Amino acid sequence: MSSWENYNKVLGQMAAFGIELQKKDAGFPKKIGAKVTCGKGGKDFYKVYEFDRNGKTYLTGGFGTYRHGGTYQKIEVEWAPLSDEERNRQQAQRQAQIEAARARAAQEAELARSSAIDLWRKASPDGVSPYLERKGLRGESCRYLAKPITLRWPADRPGEQDTVVRLPEGTLVLPLIRYDFPKAEALRALQFIRPDGAKVYLKGFEKPGCALRLGDADHSPLVMVCEGYATGLSIRLGVDGQFPVFVAWDAGNLAHVVPLVRALYPDKRLLICADDDWKTFDKRTGRLNNPGRTTAKKVAKDVPGCDLVWPVFTVADRGDKDTDFDDLRKLEGLHVVRRQLTGLIRDMGRVYG
């Protein structure tokens, strides 16, 4: 039996929103006042607070998803009118929770950064990734695990089991970098891609603004931005390595990475190479929402000097998950990726000089 009056209503609101809590999400909420990743594939999140009122405790805050480019919804609570005294008490309580959560988040982010530095140093710059081999790609700006390692994160609550992740030899290691931070503080976390393709992030870091640059951007008139690492490698092949690519990791992070890249390179043209999530539907409405294109369009509109492209597939057997330029390369060939990208870049050169 939960200690929150509106516990089941909150779970119902999350389910109606489209969040499917998994076994790993047992014990909801795992934290109070801190953002917690949840749902299928870790694509959703929640951030809740506790409020005491008339001797009862309620959950407030909200939840959201990266699948919709960062869609967010507040928890709906039916409140009776508040007295000034009660309102002031609740505001003070929430502020205390916010400050405590910020302190915990800062501590966790620092632990993630320290772990990233240590594990990055231990990883080898030379190696083989079965994941990349299957895709026919060569790694760039990455490292490899020369021997297996085990990651362990303490349980959030007493009585729960620690999280244990085993990473075998051949795991690909990718740095998540804040390029606007001082060099000594730029590495924030790591993403591991195991030989079977499973992806694991270090726990506790803050993803917004983190990216990975493929290639040199200082002497290029054009900077490209995409979601995934394999997508970035295929784009680099498609332009024969002439232009750099920033990997933003997911659609939601484009809204943070693209403005950051614009600030770093104010005189360069930007090109977002979006995913075409042609079979992604909003679970709340049942409508096609295509977060890859939808988010990229908004970012391209909001950020000056930014253009947009997405892969155009012509094969009849395109799968539901064939969405990006890496999928296009595998289905239709590198020459198709090259034609679509270089043709647009030539047009941009004629328009913008």
Regions found by a protein language model. Name each.
Residues 1-8, 220-221, 234-353:
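TOPRIM fold recognition
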Residues 1-131, 277:
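Non-catalytic accessory segments of DNA primases and related replication-initiation nucleases
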Residues 16-19, 137-140, 305-306:
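Short aromatic/hydrophobic-glycine micro-motifs
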Residues 28-32, 147-152, 313-324:
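A short acidic, often aromatic-flanked loop/helix-cap motif at beta-alpha or helix-coil junctions
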Residues 61, 168-172, 321:
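Residues that flank catalytic or metal-binding motifs in active/ligand-binding sites
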Residues 73-169, 177-203:
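Extended, non-catalytic subsegments within catalytic or DNA/protein-binding/adaptor domains
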Residues 151-266:
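Phosphate-handling DNA/RNA-contact segment within nucleic-acid enzymes
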